Amino acid sequence: MIWERCCTGVDQVRQARDGNASRVELCSHLELDGLTPSRRDIEASVALGIPVNVMVRPRGGRFVYSEEEVFIMLEQIEFCGRAGASAGVVGCLDDKYGIDVAATSRLVERAARFGLGFTFHRAFDLCPDKEKSLGELIDIGCTRVLTSGGAPTAMEGASVIARLVCISAGRIIVMPGGGVTPSNVSRLQSLTGASEFHGTRLY
């Protein structure tokens, strides 16, 4: 079982490492559902020796991005790769809340060029047809997708997550997130068949 802890600063990353987290997701401004952290925090977190996935999101609000904003994210992904991060964490939707395939493809390609994995974050939960959207992420080449199954918590969305894990057939990692705690993670693993889990405290 891989446990990914969501962290908003270097001190939290250090605590996660010392608490035996498998990996961290580094972001800033959780009150806005997470934005790109500072370059200084990215570099300092990577230096702690734990795999660091970095949120790449230039602003709060809707997950529909302009060409200028996509360009900013491409540059941020490149920096993360050069800094030694493990993956970028991104989510781009179109006006109908489907996957923005064109933008996501460009971002995945840039991540791969700089040795980064690619997590599509919980913007996925807004997609009305999750099975179709999962297929698109697989075709694009995303490493993983973070999801609560479209429910307020992963436990409430466990049946949807289980279906997505089944459909994924090992082609993409389906990672439950949303209310995941030490007290429910084993049950959630049993219900969904997932092997990676995301939360603010998982130990």
Q: What are these model-predicted stretches?
A:
Residues 1-4:
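Extreme N-terminal starter segment of soluble prokaryotic enzymes
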Residues 6-8, 27-29, 55-57:
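Acidic/polar N-terminal loop/beta-strand segments that form early-domain functional surfaces
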Residues 35-104:
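Glycine/small-residue-rich loop that forms an oxyanion/phosphate-binding "nest" at active or ligand-binding sites
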Residues 22-35, 79-95, 140-157, 180, ...:
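Glycine-rich phosphate-binding active-site loops on the catalytic face of alpha/beta enzymes
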Residues 48-50, 83, 113-114, 168-171:
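Helix C-cap/helix->beta junction micro-motif
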Residues 8-19, 54, 62-79, 102, ...:
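Catalytic cores of alpha/beta
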Residues 31-34, 59-68, 93-100, 124-128, ...:
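Short, small-residue-enriched loops and turns at beta-alpha junctions
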